[in-house]
Structure formats: C-alpha cells, structure tokens
Swiss-Prot record:
It catalyses: Mo-molybdopterin + GTP + H(+) = Mo-molybdopterin guanine dinucleotide + diphosphate. NCBIfam families: molyb_mobA (TIGR02665). Its cofactor is Mg(2+). PANTHER family: MOLYBDENUM COFACTOR GUANYLYLTRANSFERASE. Keywords: Cytoplasm, GTP-binding, Magnesium, Metal-binding, Molybdenum cofactor biosynthesis, Nucleotide-binding, Transferase. This is Molybdenum cofactor guanylyltransferase. It comes from the Bacteria.
C-alpha cells in the first residue's frame, strides 16, 4: 500500500491554449474559480504535496498557494514536459499528474492508481475510460515512480513528446474509470457547456 504522503501531485497548466485562442486555459473561470484551482483543490486531499506546472502568468498561479514551476524546456513542448518538471521537483517516491482542464476527475483517482501500481508491481499506473466499447488510456492522468526521471529525460532528448509512447516502455498498469469524470475542456464553448450541464 502506498501512503498518500509519499505522493506529490502536479497540475499540468503549461499549455499554449491553442484551441482556446491562445488564452491561459488554467486561468479560465469555471463556477467562480480558475480551472487550475478546481484541479488543485480536487487533487490536494489525495496527495502529500502538490505543485502546479505553468509557463505563463506565474504570479496568478502562485496566488493559489502552492509551488509553481515552469517547463525546463522551451516552446511549450506539451504535457510530457510538465511531467518531467514534476519529476525533477518532487521529493517523494511517487508523482501523480492531472491536467488543469478536467475539473471533475475522480476523488479516488490517486488511491486507485496507487493500489493498482502496488498490486501489479508496476512503474506507471495510467487511468483509462471505456469509450465506444474499448478501453482508452488517459495518459496525462498517471502515477509514476520518480526514479523514472532519467528515463524520461533521455526519452525527451530524442524529440519524442507522447506520454503514452514513453510509458509503454515501462511496467505499465491501466486502471479503468467511468468516462464521465474525465470530460475535459479544450474550447471556450466546451467550458460554457460544462458549466451549463452542472448538477
């Protein structure tokens, strides 16, 4: 069993927001709070430490009260760079990542990933959802042993940027969840739709 205090959480908010017209997605208002703050507050009770990975408006993210770290790599290289930043900064044996644009992810996400990782003696546990009769991995929702830092550093030096491709080279366990909890926001219209559909 993995103790939550041995897990650091990182909220990935370092993207370009290209499909939102270039706005900083993590700072978009959702029900009175920035999206990244929703993710942070949902993740915080599930882990021992928490940080945010962001590349713009660092002061706004710092006002959320947790450490904020930009990518070490330039030019917004994607969520894998945020995961790398988390692995570089974490002081615990495990790191879990969540994106800033999925405010309703499961409140038992980390405990279920941790249980599966321990049971399978895996290095990475990744969430997945049932969609159209198939199990689809959600690669940015993953629990990783921080000892994989060197592996990820080498992988990114090759120019590859896909989380799933890197993870596939390690002992990986996939953990199924209900798809509804993983509805994410890529456009301002989708953000409005998510707000309109709230209970």
């Amino acid at each position: 069993m993995i103790d939550p205090k041995h897990i650091t959480g990182v909220v990935l908010a370092g993207g370009r927001g290209a499909r939102m017209g270039g706005v900083d997605k993590g700072l978009q208002n959702h029900l009175g709070m920035p999206l990244a703050l929703h993710a942070m507050l949902r993740l915080a009770p599930q882990v021992g430490e928490i940080m945010i990975n962001a590349n713009r408006n660092l002061g706004a993210y710092e006002s959320m009260g947790v450490p904020v770290w930009p990518d070490a790599l330039a030019d917004y290289p994607g969520p894998l760079a945020g995961l790398l930043t988390g692995l570089e900064r974490a002081e615990t044996p495990y790191l879990v990542s969540v994106p800033c644009d999925t405010p309703n992810f499961p409140e038992d996400l980390v405990s279920r990933l941790a249980a599966a990782l321990a049971e399978a003696d895996a290095e990475i546990a990744m969430a997945a959802t049932h969609e159209d009769g198939a199990l689809r991995r959600q690669p940015v929702f993953c629990l990783v042993k921080t000892e994989l830092l060197d592996s990820l550093t080498r992988f990114m030096q090759t120019g590859e940027r896909k989380v799933g491709l890197w993870a596939a080279g390690h002992r990986l366990v996939t953990v199924p969840f209900e798809a509804a909890a993983f509805v994410n926001v890529n456009t301002l219209a989708e953000l409005q739709q998510l707000q309109d559909e709230r209970p």
